[in-house]
Amino acid sequence: MNDLSGKTVIITGGARGLGAEAARQAVAAGARVVLADVLDEEGAATARELGDAARYQHLDVTIEEDWQRVVAYAREEFGSVDGLVNNAGISTGMFLETESVERFRKVVDINLTGVFIGMKTVIPAMKDAGGGSIVNISSAAGLMGLALTSSYGASKWGVRGLSKLAAVELGTDRIRVNSVHPGMTYTPMTAETGIRQGEGNYPNTPMGRVGNEPGEIAGAVVKLLSDTSSYVTGAELAVDGGWTTGPTVKYVMGQ
């Protein structure tokens, strides 16, 4: 059982989608959560939905002072910080040749630098708590070369590498660091890019479909936060319907 009783978890990008569902599952497992996002109305509403175990704080992940405030708030409200889910991010859909330098820098700043600042800021609090678990949300695009993801893919490869080096550095402090790599999953954000639910829509994926809901990803996140994963660090967990394992026979044969 993924028991998070007595643990406090900060979840970025917590207003909706995967972040909100991870918060729901964490609270159901006994955790107290601080949802952090720039979508203040949605974030506050999600926190209200979750009741007394949840709080909401505004957080721009690229601003170090915002991080310091959120971590201090979590400690003041709940006494400790035991978990961090670095989920906030933005996507892109452009070829390398046509993507602007400005856009590339923006995506990397949010998706990668934001993860770095978050880990850097939370480490002292986790050391004070006697350890903790950091789950960084990367992507299937951080496991393979994927067209039309120049800035996004670069940032998610960076998250994967940053997770591994942090796991090496922080292991003796009893702080575990792992990355989760979702495949195409239906969320409010991905729906805007044309992601469709239903069997058979993605024949190049062994399971033939996208993730139907964020809950299919959130379960892996909560598992890594819990003590049932106490000997798991530096791992990269693909939750992608087998997409990064390899193409299906029908896809290879052009059927």
Curated annotation (Swiss-Prot):
Highest taxon of the lineage: Bacteria
EC number: 1.1.1.53
Active-site feature positions: Y152 (proton acceptor)
Catalytic activity entry: androstan-3alpha,17beta-diol + NAD(+) = 17beta-hydroxyandrostanone + NADH + H(+)
UniProt entry keywords in alphabetical sequence: Lipid metabolism, NAD, Oxidoreductase, Steroid metabolism
Pathway named in the protein's UniProt entry: Lipid metabolism; C21-steroid hormone metabolism
GO biological process terms on file: C21-steroid hormone metabolic process
Transmembrane segments: none
Molecular function per GO: androstan-3-alpha,17-beta-diol dehydrogenase (NAD+) activity
Ligand binding (NAD(+)): 10-34
Database matches in InterPro entries: NAD(P)-bd_dom_sf, Sc_DH/Rdtase_CS, SDR_fam
CDD domains in the cross-refs: 3beta-17beta-HSD_like_SDR_c (cd05341)
EC class (word): oxidoreductase
Binding annotation for substrate: S139
Subunit architecture: Homotetramer.
Family classification: Belongs to the short-chain dehydrogenases/reductases (SDR) family.
Protein name, as recorded: 3-alpha-(or 20-beta)-hydroxysteroid dehydrogenase
